[in-house]
Structure formats: C-alpha cells, structure tokens
C-alpha cells in the first residue's frame, strides 16, 4: 500500500489489458476555433435525454416560454429539460429522436421569437456559503446529465458519493477517433473547468483530484497547466493514447491502479468520475444559474467542407448543423451520431441534438470503406485480446445468437462498454457490438416483464389477503350480532317470555264456568286424581330406572335380558297410565261444558279409569318385583316369572280396553237420555269390578 501511494505521488500511471490503436482523425476539427451556431427556425426538445424516466410536462401548446424556463418537472432521477431560447410552443407531439431504433418520442416543438430573452436568474457568487443539499438541488434543477455519453443524472451520482469518495477523477481522455469537443472546450474554457472542479471538491471532499488526459492533446494540456498554476490539490495526469482509455473502469485503472469489480461501479472502490463537459455545465449552473440548454458538438468528416466544433442549442436539428459546416450529401447518405466505433447511423437527418450528442460524423464514401459481408466466426481469439473489459466476446456472441440469456448474463454481458474494439479487430466482419446491444435489450425486456409479473402477483396476493380479512371480519360481526343482544332486544325477549308465562299460569289455574250453570267439583276431583296418577307414573319411572341400574350389575346375560323386558313393560304401562289420565281430564272438561249431569257421569268414568290405571300399575310393579326376586334366586324361576308377568300384563291391557269401551258406551247413552246414562254407569261399574277381580283374584 505504501508503494502504491508513493507511485501516485510520482505521477505513476498504469495500463489496462486489451485496447486498440485506430487512426485518430482529430486534426480536422481540433485546430479550428469553436463557433456558435445560430438559432434554427424550429427547436425540437425531447422530454427524455438522460438515463431514466421522462419528466412531467409543465407547459402547454401555444404557451410563450423564456430562455432557461423548465419544460418538465424534475423529481428524483428524473432530470428536467429547459427551453433553449424564448419563443412559442407550437406543438407537443412525438418526433424521431437520436436513437438507433429510430422510434418517435414525445417532444416539445418551440418556434424561437429571435429575442433570446432569459428567465429571471439568481447567480451564486460564492457557492461556499451554500450547503451541500442546496448545491445538489441547484445541479439537479439545471437538468445536468453526464455529457460524456452515458447520460446518468449528475446530481444523483454526486449524492451517492457524498460519503466515502477518496479520489475524484476528471475524464479528459476523449479517446474515440474524430471527436474533439472536450479538446476544444479545454483549450478555450480551461478556467471554467478548474472552477467546476473546485465546486466538486467542496461537495465531495475527496483526498485527491486527478485529471486524466491523453497525450494527443498538447494544446489542451498546456491550457490546463496554465489554469492550474497556483492551484493545490489538483493533479494533471497525461496518459498514453490508447482506445478506450476514456472508459470509466479503464481510466480508473490507469490513474489509480485499482480495478473495478465485475458488476460494480468505480464508486465501490472510492472513486468518482466526471466528464470535462459535465464539469463546465456544473460551474455554469451553480455560479451563473444557467441550465443545460447548449453543448459543444463536433462536426467532422470528409463530407463537410468546414468541419469544427459548435456551441449548439439542445433541440437543434442535425441537418441544420450540417449545413453550417458545409455538408455535401453522399450516395448512399451516411451520417453517424457519435464516433466511428461507438456511434450509430442516424435514421433521419431531422433528429435533434440532445444532451449526450458530442459528435456528428459525416464521412465520405471512400472514407469509411466498403462494408464487407458478415462471415462465420473462425475462433481466432483476436476479440478476446482486444477487449478492455476482460470479457469473452466470442462466447457472448454465441450466447447472444442462441438467445441463451442467463448464460450471457452470467458471463458479465452488462460489463461490456460497447467500445467496438472486438468488432474492429474481427477478421470475419461480425458486428459484435450490435449483437451485444440487442441481447442487452432483450434481457432488460425480460427483466421488466418478470418485474411486472411479480408486481401483478403481489397485487393479486394482497387482494386475496384483503378479501380473506374482510370475510373473517364480516363473519365475526355476524357472530357478534347473533350472540350479543342490545338492551332493546333483551327487553323484547323478556316481555315475550313474561306473556307466555302468564298465559300458561292462567290456563292451568282458571276454570271457566258457563253462565247459568252450577259449578261441579267432580271435574276438579277427576283432574286431581289424574295428577295423582301422573305422579305415580313418574314414581314408577324412577323405580324402573333404579331397577335398570340394579340389573346392570347382574353378571348373567339371561338375567340382563329379563331385566330389560321388565323395564320395557314398566315404561309401556306408564305411558298408558299417562294416556288414560289425559283422556279423563279431557272427558271431564267436555262434560262440564255440556251438562252438569253429563259432568257427573264423566267424573265417574274418570274415577273408574284412574282406579284401573292404578291397579294396572300395581300389577306391573308386583310382576317386576316378582321377576326380580325370581331372577335373583334362579334363572329358571326368572324365566317363569317373566312369563307370568307377560300374562298379567296382557290381562291388564284387556281390562283397560274393556273399561274404555264401557266409558265410551256410557258416554253415548248419556248423550241420549239421563236414565240410560245412569244404567250405563251402573253396568260400567259392574264390568270394572269384574275386570279387577280377573286381574287380581286374591
């Protein structure tokens, strides 16, 4: 570590693997002073000119705008765009933009009024009096994105490096052939470059600041050295010319000796890098309150009679600039935005200049040479030797052609900087960078689809969970409503129960006597006897239950069978007794309602039926007791006792049937004539007495 630090102190530089040395072709434009492009008749400002989503519009068609007025809202990583001049917004419509696909994007069309009037400006003479967040917000609202070609929002990048940045690198390499925008900017505005560096030092507080510049820019090196006189903490490093030494990872390796890990950025090792053009834009935004509305664009190529570098407003059509440089159309026409290795052919010359447009190359037909057809890969390995990122271009090519997305991703496809070195050395003329770009786009599309599917799944699961929660809550409310009664509901229930209780008490205790008739106690006596019979029946049931419990303790199965038979007989007789009692009560009630004499007859019949029911119950009880005693003495005696009990029970049933017939006959006779009723009652009493003697001869 000490040796590494000592080497840095002595201006030591390192080298990176790979790289190529193509013809530089820079003298066509680097020796010509910069010119200011006049305003065109129409400016076309795309809403998205950076890496990230487009901003929300703040203007409408037909509205007058001033120079530097925001056209969109900038939030987060959304960088706003501004009006390059004053004028009227004639349309907000899609237009072809500077992209290899040639797709149309939403743009604001402004017709300049020629006055070029600024909005109200608030310069900051001393930026050191402002806190870091105010400076970051100023840079963000100025719409500054990386002017080196990536277009990453500068404020977001700086905010991520507020803590932990050791080395600040200013990228002045500009390694790609033909491009000289940064070269001329450093030659003519070196003081602004140094001022912008001081603003970044105030923000990031790095331990050291390094400016990396290739040795093929002697005028720019001299201008920076003059601007750095008397400046401490800023070191100029001149590096050998090699493509692509201007790459972020490659220049980091050259100046610090550190390698950025795969899948990481230079900030992961404490390094933050900014382009020279971005530094000048930061100075103008912070101190002069000028948003990013213009940039330096290199116009070069043999198809131009007067190449050079121009200060061009954002939104200026490419064809307008080409005419300023003396464009001579070729057949077939070819205009490249960017350099010959990393640029792309424009689908139309009507596309506008954007924030990342650093060069417009218009080559002659003989300058670029004839395009040769693509041939099969011969596995020579030259692409591997030329790759500055340490990748395997040959394998990535096969993965891209075979649509093996995961393998391409695992082989660090996204670490490819698309420098074009592999395609430059390929003897088979395979456009490797095009395959890589297409594969990256497909992987990003698949990732976006997967993300949308995951979001849809999450929304569906959240909805299902919400419905389940609502269902449980609804069921709980229903249960609570069914169980918990309000005070009003409880009062209603109590009132209903009270009414039923009063009705029940009144039906049992009140006896209605028709008008004009004398009360007769015979029905009351009969009802009393019936209640006594019911009580005796309940007593019999209790005795039956006790007998059943006793018989469960008997070990012999035959004894258990006999006990069960006796229990069934007792239950049957108890039910018959209850039935007889009910009939007696009903008969008594009817008799009272019709005639006192009939009531007397009905009462007599009821008394007879009650007496017979009691005798039948007594017989059943005796039979059960006898059966129990016999069962306890001997199984054979138990069987005999059970047979005798069945016979007695049968006779009791016959006697009850006879009694019922007598009662019915008496009722019919009573209905015809009182004297016949008396005779029938006497006959019934005689028959009942005989039946009782037959049941119990003792």
UniProtKB/Swiss-Prot annotation:
Q: Where is the 4Fe-4S ferredoxin-type domain?
A: 366-397, 407-436
Q: Where is the signal peptide?
A: none
Predominantly, its location class is membrane
Catalytic class of the enzyme: translocase
Q: What membrane topology was assigned to this protein in its record?
A: Peripheral membrane protein
**EC number(s) reported in the record:** 7.-.-.-
| A single cellular component GO annotation | plasma membrane
The terms under GO molecular function for this entry are:
4 iron, 4 sulfur cluster binding; electron transfer activity; metal ion binding
Which keywords are on file for this protein? 4Fe-4S, Cell inner membrane, Cell membrane, Electron transport, Iron, Iron-sulfur, Membrane, Metal-binding, Repeat, Translocase, Transport
InterPro entries referenced in this protein's UniProt entry, alphabetically: 4Fe4S_Fe-S-bd (IPR017896), 4Fe4S_Fe_S_CS (IPR017900), Ion_transpt_RnfC/RsxC (IPR010208), Nuo51_FMN-bd (IPR011538), Nuo51_FMN-bd_sf (IPR037225), RnfC_N (IPR026902), Soluble_ligand-bd (IPR019554)
What biological-process terms (Gene Ontology) are attached?
electron transport chain
Which cofactor does the UniProt annotation name? Answer: [4Fe-4S] cluster
Residues that bind [4Fe-4S] cluster 2, according to the entry? 387, 416, 419, 422
Q: How does it assemble?
A: The complex is composed of six subunits: RnfA, RnfB, RnfC, RnfD, RnfE and RnfG.
Indicate the family of this protein.
Answer: Belongs to the 4Fe4S bacterial-type ferredoxin family. RnfC subfamily.
Q: Name the job this protein performs.
A: Part of a membrane-bound complex that couples electron transfer with translocation of ions across the membrane.
NCBIfam families reported in the protein's UniProt record: PRK05035.1, rnfC
* Protein's recorded name: Ion-translocating oxidoreductase complex subunit C
Question: Which species expresses this protein natively?
Answer: Yersinia pseudotuberculosis serotype O:3 (strain YPIII)
């Amino acid at each position: 570590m000490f040796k590494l630090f000592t080497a840095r102190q002595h201006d030591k530089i390192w080298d990176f693997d790979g790289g190529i040395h193509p013809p530089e072709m820079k003298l066509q434009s680097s020796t010509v002073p910069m010119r200011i492009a006049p305003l065109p008749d129409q400016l076309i400002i795309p809403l998205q000119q950076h890496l990230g989503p487009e901003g929300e519009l703040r203007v409408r068609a037909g509205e007058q705008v001033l120079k530097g007025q925001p056209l969109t809202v900038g939030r987060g990583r959304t960088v706003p765009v501004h009006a390059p001049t004053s004028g009227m917004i004639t349309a907000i419509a899609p237009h072809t933009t500077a992209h290899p696909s040639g797709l149309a994007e939403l743009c604001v069309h402004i017709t300049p009024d020629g006055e070029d009037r600024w909005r109200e400006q608030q310069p900051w003479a001393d930026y050191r009096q402002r806190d870091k967040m105010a400076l970051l917000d100023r840079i963000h609202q100025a719409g500054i994105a990386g002017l080196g070609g990536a277009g990453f929002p500068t404020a977001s990048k700086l905010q991520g490096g507020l803590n932990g940045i050791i080395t600040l690198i200013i990228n002045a390499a500009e390694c790609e052939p033909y491009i000289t925008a940064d070269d001329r900017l450093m030659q003519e505005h070196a003081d602004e470059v140094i001022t912008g560096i001081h603003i970044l030092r105030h923000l990031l507080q790095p331990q050291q600041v390094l400016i990396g510049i290739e040795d093929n820019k002697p005028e720019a090196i001299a201008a920076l050295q003059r601007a750095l006189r008397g400046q401490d903490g800023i070191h100029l490093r001149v590096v050998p010319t090699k493509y692509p030494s201007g790459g972020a990872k490659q220049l980091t390796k050259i100046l610090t000796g550190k390698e950025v890990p795969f899948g990481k950025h230079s900030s992961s090792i404490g390094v933050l890098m900014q382009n020279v053009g971005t530094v000048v834009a930061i100075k103008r935004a912070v101190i002069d309150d000028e948003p990013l509305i213009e940039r330096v664009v290199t116009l070069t190529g043999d198809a131009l009679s007067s190449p050079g570098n121009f200060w061009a407003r954002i939104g200026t059509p490419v064809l307008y600039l080409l005419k300023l440089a003396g464009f001579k159309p070729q057949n077939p026409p070819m205009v490249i935005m960017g350099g010959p290795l990393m640029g792309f052919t424009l689908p139309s010359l009507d596309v506008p200049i954007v924030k990342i447009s650093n060069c417009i190359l218009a080559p002659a037909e003989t300058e670029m040479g004839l395009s040769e057809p693509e041939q099969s890969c011969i596995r020579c390995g030259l692409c591997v030797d030329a790759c500055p990122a340490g990748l395997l271009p040959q394998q990535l090519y096969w993965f891209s052609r075979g649509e093996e997305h995961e393998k391409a991703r695992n082989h660090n496809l996204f670490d490819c900087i698309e420098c074009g070195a592999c395609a430059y050395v390929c003897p088979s003329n395979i456009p490797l960078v095009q395959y890589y770009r297409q594969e990256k786009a497909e992987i990003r599309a698949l990732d976006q689809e997967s993300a949308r599917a995951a979001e849809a799944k999450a929304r569906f699961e959240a909805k299902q969970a919400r419905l389940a929660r609502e269902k449980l809550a609804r069921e709980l409310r229903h249960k609570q409503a069914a169980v918990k009664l309000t005070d009003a509901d409880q009062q209603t229930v109590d009132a209903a129960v009270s009414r039923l209780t009063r009705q029940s008490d009144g039906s049992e205790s009140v006896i209605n006597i028709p008008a004009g008739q004398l009360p007769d106690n015979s029905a009351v006596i009969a009802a009393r006897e019936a209640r006594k019979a019911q009580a005796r029946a309940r007593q019999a049931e209790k005795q039956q239950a006790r007998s059943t419990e006793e018989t469960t303790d008997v070990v012999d199965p035959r004894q258990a069978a006999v006990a069960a038979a006796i229990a069934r007989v007792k239950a049957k007789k108890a039910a018959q007794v209850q039935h007889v009692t009910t009939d007696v009560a009903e008969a008594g009630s009817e008799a009272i309602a019709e005639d006192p004499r009939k009531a007397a007859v009905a009462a007599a019949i009821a008394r007879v039926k009650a007496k017979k029911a009691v005798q039948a119950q007594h017989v059943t009880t005796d039979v059960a007791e006898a059966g129990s005693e016999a069962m306890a003495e001997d199984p054979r005696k138990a069987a005999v006792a059970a047979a005798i009990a069945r016979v007695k029970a049968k006779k009791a049933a016959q006697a009850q049937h006879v009694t019922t017939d007598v009662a019915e006959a008496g009722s019919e006779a009573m209905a015809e004539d009182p004297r016949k009723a008396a005779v029938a009652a006497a006959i019934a009493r005689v028959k009942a007495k005989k039946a009782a003697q037959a049941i119990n001869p003792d």
